[in-house]
Every structure is written in structure tokens, then in C-alpha cells.
């Protein structure tokens, strides 16, 4: 069943920058957003992130833990512990892709969140659990007869590197996003950011190595915040080197979430719109062309 939710939005207009955000001028009006709600049983779609509080919702046939947009093909994929799905963003229909999970390639059922995003340099998707589990799904057709195609492999669990300001802290990654998410093609390089609800920080994540380095604390209006693990984070790129970061954030103690732009240098979150609901898990945006 499809439902439409419309709420008042915050009007805004900001200028573009390579490490921050585009803003909601005409260049953003064609970018769609996708999220999960109601414990992963509902797909939420934003026809345009220029009006993020105008949403359509679709009841899913299976619970999903996360969603990710595949820049090379324009597909939306979903992950549930033990399965990878293609997701029809216009209906919410799920198709199990029959992925093989290697030994240990599972995120704990007790994990509060799962992050998921495509590495556009290799066209494979990384899933990171708040429990530290670090997985990669290599899609159908990956590489040239690559034996990893349509399988999920486990890599080094996430940890803060020696000398980091959060060294010794147990991370709770709930969202991740790669730069250079250009539409329709692989990127020459990418860099992975993530959000940690335990340290309330924007961090870098060194792919298979699992190494975390703190970039900055997340702030709103210059003040530190207490992030919950409900929400998501993604980057859209008009071209290589031009990255716009967006996030759905819900603060601890709040019942509803907000839609924010994220400065990838300072960690500053700028409110773009108050959303009419909370409890989101996962977030993805479509390509930027």
C-alpha cells in the first residue's frame, strides 16, 4: 500500500562546495531520497530532497536493515541479515538476489543499526553493523567472471586507530557514505565517511581494514549533539570531487528526525527540514545528474 505524507518544510538555500553540500536550488530538485521506517518494514521515498518532508511510504514484504543506491546502474538495493534484495522504489517490491553469505558474514541480530553504501570505485556495497561487523556484497556480474560475484564477505571489524581522539572507544557505526558517487559510471577513487552514535562523530572508515579516524564531532548550530542510531547518511556527486552529504538524524530523547546537510570537513549539520516522523533506519539518495 502506498501512502503520501506531507509536512511543512524549512525553506533553505545554500551554495555548493566540494566538501559540503549543494543546497536545494534547482540542481537538487531531481535528486530522490530513500529511507526505511517502522523497524525496517516500510520504504519511505522522497521524490525530491528539495522537499524532503513530502514522502510516499510503501509496506515491504520483508523487513530490511538498510538500503543503498547503486550509482553505476541506478538500482536500489536492500539488505536484511541473510539476504540482499533489489528494491522497486516505485512500489516497494522486493526481489531476493540469492546472495551467498560466507562463514561469519552476518551482522548480529542485537545490532541497533546497519550502515550500507556503494563504493563507486569498484561497484560493490559495504554493510557495517553497529556491532562492528564489516561486510561487502559483490553484486551479480561483479568483475570479469569474479568468483566473489553475488556473495557477501566479512572483513576486519571497525575500531579506532591508535592515537585517535576516540582510541579505545567501542564504535557504533549507524551510517556510511562514499564520495564520488557519480551517476552512470565508476569513479576513479572514493573515500568513505561514517557516523558513529557512540562518539557522536563524523569519522573516516578505511574499507576492509576497518580503521576509524575521527574527522569531527557532529554539531548543530555550533553545539555538540547526542546522536541516536536512528537515521542515515549518503553522498551524491554531480562530478568527481564535488560531493554533497545529506543525513537523516534523530537526537537522543527526540521523537522525530530532521533532514540535514553535513559538512564533511567540520561535521557541522545544517537543518534543511523537520521530518514528520522518526525511527528511520538507513538512507540513500539517487545520482546527481
Ranges and model annotations:
Residues 32-36, 74-78, 85, 123-127, ...:
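Conserved beta-propeller blade signature
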Residues 51-59, 93-106, 146-166, 211-225, ...:
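A short beta-strand motif characteristic of beta-propeller blades
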Residues 40-46, 83-88, 132-139, 198-207, ...:
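Structural motif
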Residues 23-49:
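An edge-strand/N-cap motif at the start of beta-rich repeat modules
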Residues 1-20:
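Gram-negative bacterial Sec-dependent N-terminal signal peptides
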Residues 19-28, 66-74, 105-123, 168-188, ...:
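Structural signature of eukaryotic scaffold interfaces centered on beta-propeller domains
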Residues 28, 36-39, 79, 128-130, ...:
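Short, solvent-exposed loop/turn segments at conserved positions within beta-propeller repeat blades
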Residues 268-289:
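Blade-level signature of beta-propeller repeat domains, shared across WD40, Kelch, NHL, RCC1
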Amino acid at each position: 500500500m502506498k501512502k503520501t505524507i506531507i509536512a511543512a518544510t524549512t525553506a533553505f538555500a545554500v551554495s555548493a562546495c566540494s566538501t559540503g553540500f549543494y543546497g536545494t536550488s534547482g540542481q537538487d530538485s531531481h535528486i530522490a531520497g530513500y529511507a526505511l521506517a517502522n523497524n525496517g518494514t516500510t520504504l519511505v521515498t522522497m521524490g525530491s530532497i528539495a522537499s524532503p518532508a513530502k514522502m510516499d511510504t510503501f509496506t515491504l514484504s520483508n523487513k530490511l536493515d538498510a538500503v543503498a543506491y547503486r550509482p553505476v546502474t541506478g538500482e536500489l538495493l536492500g539488505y536484511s541479515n541473510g539476504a540482499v534484495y533489489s528494491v522497486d522504489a516505485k512500489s516497494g517490491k522486493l526481489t531476493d538476489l540469492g546472495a551467498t553469505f560466507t562463514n561469519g558474514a552476518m551482522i548480529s541480530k542485537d545490532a541497533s543499526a546497519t550502515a550500507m553504501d556503494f563504493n563507486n570505485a569498484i561497484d560493490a556495497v559495504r554493510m557495517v553493523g553497529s556491532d562492528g561487523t564489516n561486510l561487502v556484497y559483490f553484486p551479480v556480474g561483479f568483475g570479469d567472471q569474479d568468483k566473489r560475484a553475488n556473495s557477501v564477505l566479512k572483513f576486519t571489524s571497525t575500531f579506532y586507530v591508535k592515537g585517535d581522539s576516540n582510541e579505545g572507544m567501542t564504535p557504533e557505526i549507524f551510517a556510511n557514505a562514499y564520495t564520488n558517487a557519480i551517476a552512470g559510471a565508476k569513479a576513479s577513487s572514493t573515500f568513505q565517511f561514517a557516523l558513529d552514535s557512540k562518539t557522536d562523530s563524523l569519522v573516516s572508515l578505511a574499507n576492509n581494514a576497518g580503521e576509524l579516524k575521527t574527522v569531527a564531532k557532529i554539531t548543530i548550530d555550533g553545539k555538540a549533539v547526542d546522536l541516536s542510531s536512528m537515521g542515515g547518511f549518503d553522498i551524491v556527486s554531480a562530478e568527481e570531487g564535488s560531493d554533497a552529504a545529506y543525513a537523516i538524524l534523530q537526537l537522543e530523547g527526540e521523537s522525530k528526525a530532521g533532514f540535514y546537510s553535513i559538512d564533511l570537513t567540520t561535521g557541522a549539520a545544517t537543518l534543511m527540514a523537520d521530518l514528520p516522523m522518526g525511527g528511520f533506519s538507513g538512507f540513500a539518495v539517487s545520482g546527481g545528474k
